[in-house]
């Protein structure tokens, strides 16, 4: 059985600690992937987790989702996240069983599996999630008729129907064109701004962090450097970690 992260009773509002790591060590099999990692994620922050493949971004997500126990140190979640329905997760892609006649409504309502939501509340939840994902009025449409970008929006809606305090996205805009990518980020930015949702977004795309992020985490060489985007995206910090400088806002890296 995987040990759950420690639960804290302190901090729940915008700016208070939702996730705290103290000298955290994470393993993938026998290999130590991340070591001596410390950071604090405050409520209402928009984080971008950046780094090459194999540097520990997905391993960190697994720990945050309770799928991987720390090999050392401490990972503490606020008590409001102890109910896993308070955490929404958006994967890179999802392939429902093609035999099923899946409507957008049926697909999005899968996000309520395991959540304690009264039947009378579900229609309002669905309407809210579709509106925030830019899919209003499409609930009766077939999932299979959606474009790639619309399917990613449906994945976002499926996570949002839980009304999560923490939304985690694992490279959800990979393989999407620039305009679709930007539209999805605009959806997330509005959610962050209007609802105060804390967002963790894993990506290789430095330009997204430059434009949208309040905080970033840089993964490199078994370490994670975390802090405000204005500090970590300075050329000298990026040069030290990756030998690169950030693009200007709006320039795709």
Where are these regions (language model features)?
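Helix-to-loop junction immediately C-terminal to a conserved catalytic motif
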Residues: 65
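H-loop (His-switch) and adjacent beta-strand-loop-beta switch element
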Residues: 216-229
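Conserved ABC ATPase signature
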Residues: 142-146, 150
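Conserved catalytic motifs of ABC-family nucleotide-binding domains
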Residues: 163
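Catalytic Walker B motif of ABC-type/P-loop ATPase nucleotide-binding domains
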Residues: 167-171
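H-loop/switch region of ABC-family ATPase nucleotide-binding domains
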Residues: 203-204
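Conserved ABC ATPase "signature" region
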Residues: 121-138
